[in-house]
Amino acid sequence: MAYIQLQFHSDALMMQVTVNVILPERATTMIGMEANGTDTFKTLYLLHGLSDDHSIWMRRTSIERYASEYNIAVVMPSVGRSWYTDTVRGEKYLTFVSEELPGKCRGFFKGMSEKPEDNIVAGLSMGGYGALKVALTHPDRFGMCASLSGALDIAQIKDPGLLPEWRCIFDMNLQSADELAGTEHDLMFLASQLHEKGIAFPKTFIWCGEDDFLLQHNHNFAAHLTSLGVDFKYEISEGNHGWIWWDMHIQNALKYLIG
């Protein structure tokens, strides 16, 4: 696999950005890992959590090895603490991840398919929320999505310490998280919108650990999808909000989605 640290100017964010990219590679003398790259390939957009950045998946997991197994590209952006949202301050993080970033990458690197069935978005914690937000907002661009320990019921986040920064992201007048219910920031609302419009749901994998503080969020969202008749994969198993589990279950996500 080729590993590239990419820097370019984002019009959506109005600033320079850094993105880590892994690309399939052809090689005949590589030891310990397959290098059977093809001319076209699927792309995984892999999203970080609240405290992290574009580097974290490379530093904490073996994502390069997993990507090699499935012959996929992996694109890892950095979005700060934006909740993958077009903020009220003007930074368009949802637009960046769902529109601008794929377009830029396809321009820079040949072989990345534009077909929805060849584009996956996945993430952990805040990134799990972001992955489903991207996929449910743009199912015409992302045919598969995965959340690990995702904050999937944002209206139920009861941390008052987040409100000051959330007012700069979601709504300047926000008084509590439950005001986000029924808006474009609510994953259940987005799922219901797809159902009402008869739009095909992205192939979806959700995992959360039994000891994760976001477990009830995942139960709530899974129950909502079930009520809509959505066919999806929901796994609950041993684990908490930590990398030993995310490294394990990103493999399960890839196996379910494209294996």
Model segments located where?
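Non-catalytic cap/lid and distal C-terminal segments of serine-dependent acyl enzymes
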Residues: 1-259
